[in-house]
């Protein structure tokens, strides 16, 4: 009975202390080459903990899939970037996560690298508010 109580206590502690995969507010730097500067935009994305494991002995019959916190549903919003040249397209469309879950990283829609550029990277070096 004590071991069951201990397991329950540890499970509750993990649920409280370790954030699960959930929506979070982030600030991203958006840029267009025609505008030559970056603008900070607030959006919603997924962050948190997903249970995963890396087996010591690899089984070729069973693929080892690491799960990451990623979007389940998203919508796109569009903003007009101020200060762009008159002849250029000053609209920028960016993703907004509306629901999150733990899943395999989809490299077709997500940067699955260990060290990506990050959401605040600006190739022009100048940020406009």
Curated annotation (Swiss-Prot):
Signal sequence annotation: 1-18
Keywords: Disulfide bond, Glycoprotein, Hormone, Secreted, Signal
Biological function: Together with the alpha chain CGA constitutes follitropin, the follicle-stimulating hormone, and provides its biological specificity to the hormone heterodimer. Binds FSHR, a G protein-coupled receptor, on target cells to activate downstream signaling pathways. Follitropin is involved in follicle development and spermatogenesis in reproductive organs.
Entry keyword Secreted: yes
Protein name: Follitropin subunit beta
Disulfide topology: 21-69, 35-84, 38-122, 46-100, 50-102, 105-112
InterPro entries: Cystine-knot_cytokine, Glyco_hormone_CN, Gonadotropin_bsu, Gonadotropin_bsu_CS
Compartment(s) of residence: Secreted
Family note: Belongs to the glycoprotein hormones subunit beta family.
Main location: secreted
Subunit structure: Heterodimer. The active follitropin is a heterodimer composed of an alpha chain/CGA shared with other hormones and a unique beta chain/FSHB shown here.
Gene that specifies this protein: FSHB
GO BP: follicle-stimulating hormone signaling pathway; G protein-coupled receptor signaling pathway; regulation of signaling receptor activity
Single GO MF descriptor: follicle-stimulating hormone activity
Database matches in SUPFAM superfamilies: Cystine-knot cytokines
A single Gene Ontology CC term: extracellular space
Family matches, as PROSITE patterns: GLYCO_HORMONE_BETA_1, GLYCO_HORMONE_BETA_2
Glycosylation sites: 25, 42
């Amino acid at each position: 009975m004590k071991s069951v109580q201990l397991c329950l206590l540890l499970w509750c502690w993990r649920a409280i202390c370790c954030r699960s995969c959930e929506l979070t507010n982030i600030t991203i730097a958006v840029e267009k080459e025609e505008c030559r500067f970056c603008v900070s935009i607030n959006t919603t994305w997924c962050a948190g903990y997903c249970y995963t494991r890396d087996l010591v002995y690899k089984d070729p019959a069973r693929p080892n899939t690491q799960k990451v916190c990623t979007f389940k549903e998203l919508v796109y919003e569009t903003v007009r970037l101020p200060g762009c040249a008159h002849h250029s397209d000053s609209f920028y469309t960016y993703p907004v996560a509306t629901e999150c879950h733990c899943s395999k990283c989809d490299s077709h829609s997500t940067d699955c690298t260990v060290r990506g550029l990050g959401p605040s990277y600006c190739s022009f070096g100048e940020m406009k508010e």
